[in-house]
From Swiss-Prot:
The keyword Chaperone does not apply. Its EC number is 2.1.1.177. The gene is rlmH. This is Ribosomal RNA large subunit methyltransferase H. It comes from Francisella tularensis subsp. novicida (strain U112). Its main location: cytoplasm. Specifically methylates the pseudouridine at position 1915 (m3Psi1915) in 23S rRNA. It holds the Pfam family SPOUT_MTase.
Amino acid sequence: MKIKIITLGEKPPKWVSDGYDEYKKRLSKSIPLELIELPIAKRTKTGNPKLWMEQEAKTILGKLNDSDHLVILDVNSKIISTEELADKMQNWKFNNPNVVILIGGPDGIDQSIKDIAKEKISISKMTFPHPLVRIIIAEQLYRAYTILEGHPYHK
């Protein structure tokens, strides 16, 4: 199984990259993680967020393959626990070896992307800075992996 995380936004601060890299390193022997950072559409004060999301959707689609199992993070979807994520990872391992987790841009994810997503999940009803979400997702993937492996990291 391979997991790609696609995120939209500007280059994050070093501490974000360091945090993400720590969990990527921990997972690297078993589950390769790939981070794809895409730029957000250019925003203006009088612009249209729907158009921006449509532009971003085109960029996202250019990074997806037909074999990808697209999972989007969506605040309006079901909040899952770490144990539920572990169950999903177990299923992905056997049924969907190319998983893509999408962290949307500041205005959300275009409906065209939502329509092709295989799964929609939420990590919280709270709002987090998008750069921080990549650390949270990487850590949760690692934690879920340790549950599956019986490792004491998750207690």
